[in-house]
Amino acid sequence: MANWRKYIPEGTKDILFQECKKKVQVENILREIYINSGFLEVKSPTLEFYDVFNIENSTLPQEKIYKLIDGQGRILALRADMTTPIARIVGTKLRDAVYPLRLCYTSNVYRVNESLNGKNSEITQSGVEVIGIKDINADAEVIIMGIKSLLNCGLENFKIEIGHAEMFKALVEDANLDYEEKEKLRESIDTKNFTALNEILHENKGKFEKSSLNVLKELPKLFGGIEIIEKASCLTCNKRAIKALEDVRKVYEIVESIGLGEYLSVDLGMVYHIDYYTGIIFRGYTQGFGGNILSGGRYDNLIAQFGENKPATGFAIDVDGIIKSLETNGNFSDKNDEKVLVYYNKQNFKEAYERAQSLREKGIVAEITHFDEEKEAREYAHSKNMKFLKI
């Protein structure tokens, strides 16, 4: 039997020294912008009951969730995302809170991934949730918060793509498609797989109104600037679809009005987690990171599954993705702290400690060495790029 004592599971990693410092730095930047914007920080247990995530229209299939059994035979789960536990907290512990609620978090989440696919099983997410307000301005505020968060971390070359969950729903609402057919159609549009899309629409063309069929064919192509909304409006008379387009336009214009339009684009073919999201949806991409570095949207039906019917919108940022992108693009501001090694003889520990403490109070990293020989201490200081102070 193999002994795995010296190894860690696939999809996890040890975070050491400078990398750990960078991660804390990014987390603190994000936390500061949230708190300064009136958000209150929450943390949920790493272990939840599996039932918390086994809900209608979950964003994660059950095979992506790590499960274990407690001493009473109940199924537990490692926290698979943060939004669902926050919905549980709101629905059970914050019923009498003053709304709207502005909550923020930074926590690790855990997801099962296929072996050797390069994805992490342990992910650090940081994000916000605005709960109890169903207004397009709240959607815009959350997107602005996402843009400001990425900018404050030092990212420059990124885009936030905006879409709407109702667009796809409106176009397929009258089609007699079963769940599997609808899911294949959704996936082909979201991944912009035109071959699969044309095949699905051809096989089911008798189930769609002609106008809806034409829009669905064009949906993956409808991405770009705000002009895409006008183009899409000319393709459909569906009232739900037109309302969705107006929502996207309003959000875009609000964000643009405060000078952040350069970070926006429209993607009406964005149709991920379509049963979970209920309104504006968005994803952020940046150079140096393969996946989406930020994702979010409006989810007005989730909290009701935990006892309180509250509308909500929010986003999650991939903290490790930010670090990777900053490193790839050479944008990471990693100032070297001044470091001093304090060497003393055995009779002078008190003086050495007081001198080191004085340096620390000035923001200087001060380490007391316990080497007997001064030569060894100097070599140690040189190897760690530290100044040498002899007491």
UniProtKB/Swiss-Prot annotation:
Taxonomically, the superkingdom here is: Bacteria
Pathway listed for it?
Amino-acid biosynthesis; L-histidine biosynthesis; L-histidine from 5-phospho-alpha-D-ribose 1-diphosphate: step 1/9
Alphabetically, which GO biological process terms does the record hold? Answer: histidyl-tRNA aminoacylation; L-histidine biosynthetic process
- Which species is the source of this protein? Clostridium kluyveri (strain ATCC 8527 / DSM 555 / NBRC 12016 / NCIMB 10680 / K1)
Q: Which InterPro entries match?
A: aa-tRNA-synth_II/BPL/LPL, HisRS-like_core, HisRS/HisZ, HisZ
GO CC list: cytoplasm
Q: Which UniProt keywords apply?
A: Amino-acid biosynthesis, Cytoplasm, Histidine biosynthesis
Which Pfam families did the record assign?
Answer: tRNA-synt_His
Q: Does the keyword Lyase apply?
A: no
Q: What protein does this entry describe? A: ATP phosphoribosyltransferase regulatory subunit
Q: What does this protein do?
A: Required for the first step of histidine biosynthesis. May allow the feedback regulation of ATP phosphoribosyltransferase activity by histidine.
Anything further noted? This function is generally fulfilled by the C-terminal part of HisG, which is missing in some bacteria such as this one.
Where does this polypeptide localize?
A: Cytoplasm
The entry sums up its family as follows:
Belongs to the class-II aminoacyl-tRNA synthetase family. HisZ subfamily.
Subunit details for this protein? Heteromultimer composed of HisG and HisZ subunits.
Q: Which NCBIfam families match?
A: hisZ_biosyn_reg, PRK12292.1-3
GO molecular-function terms, A-Z: catalytic activity, acting on a protein; histidine-tRNA ligase activity; transferase activity
